[in-house]
């Protein structure tokens, strides 16, 4: 009682009261990604942030930074590890510099449908990769979608690997993608996503490869004429928290954050699924020439890539992947 009176007197002298002391300090968490605000990543991130803020009564507040405002994916990963950034949505393949086994998500022509991939990443494959990320102080909350990647260029329609011969193609900065396009006969080179539009505009590259949603929302139709639906990779993405940030959230609020991450994973996937057909039509309206592709010769051309990388990922991880490919 005496302690309370003493504390009250001290607060009164400072012009405060016991009621002025917040029960829990609100936590603002920077969440960055490299895509445009019109992309499903950002729309889903907005829903995720709103749900978390409401359900934690403002105790946890995700502040969104789209369009590479916090840097490219490599920079954001570094920020997550050193503590300058709390959260991010990052293409899963971009985790390869800190854990090479994440390259398994980039193996060409792994999945025949998005639903097949969902089962793998929401199941044992995603759990195994999340465990590897945890060892690098990263908490993967959920597996989002980048979608099937397709090729655009300014030279002509791509119907067979021979059409890629010598084509200077921008690829993501990872060895797997470089090796894949080298096997297909192209002349690939890496470049950060934020520099891609201007590089295409200045004709530094003839071609690039991305999902339809990114091709459209990034306005690549302004600087590329041909779209070939190669579907060479189905790419996942991750909603990631730095482990030190996750540990600052109370167990009660962690449950809220995780539930919101699962909900908005499903919503983001729906956005991609619903929009892909629309994007083909929209890209045609913007003047792009679109062609379907017989995938068989492309699959044959990249078979050596699979053989080369199996030892890198190990029998256990490759075994899990193959189980889901066979329809487990």
Locations of the language-model features?
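Positively charged n-region of N-terminal signal peptides that target proteins for export
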Residues: 1-6
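Bacterial N-terminal signal peptides
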Residues: 8-19
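N-terminal secretory/targeting leader peptides
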Residues: 11, 26-116, 124-127, 131-328
């Amino acid at each position: 009682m005496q302690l309370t009176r003493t504390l009250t007197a001290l607060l009164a002298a400072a012009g405060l009261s016991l009621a002025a002391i917040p029960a829990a300090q609100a936590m603002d968490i920077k969440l960055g990604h490299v895509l445009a605000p019109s992309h499903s990543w950002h729309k889903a991130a907005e829903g995720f942030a709103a749900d978390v803020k409401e359900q934690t009564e403002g105790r946890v507040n995700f502040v969104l930074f789209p369009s590479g405002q916090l840097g490219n994916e490599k920079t954001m990963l570094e920020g997550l590890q050193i503590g300058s950034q709390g959260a991010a949505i990052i293409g899963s393949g971009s985790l390869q510099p800190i854990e090479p086994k994440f390259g398994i998500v980039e193996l060409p022509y792994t999945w025949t449908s998005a639903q097949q991939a969902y089962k793998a990443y929401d199941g044992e494959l995603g759990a195994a990769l999340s465990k590897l990320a945890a060892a690098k102080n990263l908490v993967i909350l959920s597996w989002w979608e980048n979608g099937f990647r397709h090729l655009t260029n300014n030279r002509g329609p791509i119907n067979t690997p021979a059409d890629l011969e010598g084509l200077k193609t921008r690829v993501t900065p990872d060895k797997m993608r470089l090796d894949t396009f080298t096997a297909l006969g192209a002349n690939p080179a890496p470049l950060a996503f934020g520099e891609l539009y201007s590089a295409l505009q200045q004709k530094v590259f003839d071609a690039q490869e991305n999902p339809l949603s990114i091709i459209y929302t990034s306005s690549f139709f302004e600087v590329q004429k041909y779209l070939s639906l190669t579907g060479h990779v189905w790419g996942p993405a991750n909603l990631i928290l730095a482990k030190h940030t996750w540990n600052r959230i109370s167990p009660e609020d962690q449950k809220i954050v995780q539930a919101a991450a699962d909900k908005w994973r499903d919503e983001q996937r729906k956005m991609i699924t619903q929009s892909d057909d629309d994007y083909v039509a929209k890209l045609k309206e913007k003047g792009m020439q679109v062609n379907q592709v017989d995938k068989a010769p492309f699959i044959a051309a990249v078979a050596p890539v699979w053989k080369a990388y199996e030892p890198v990922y190990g029998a256990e991880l490759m075994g899990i992947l193959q189980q889901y490919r066979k329809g487990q």
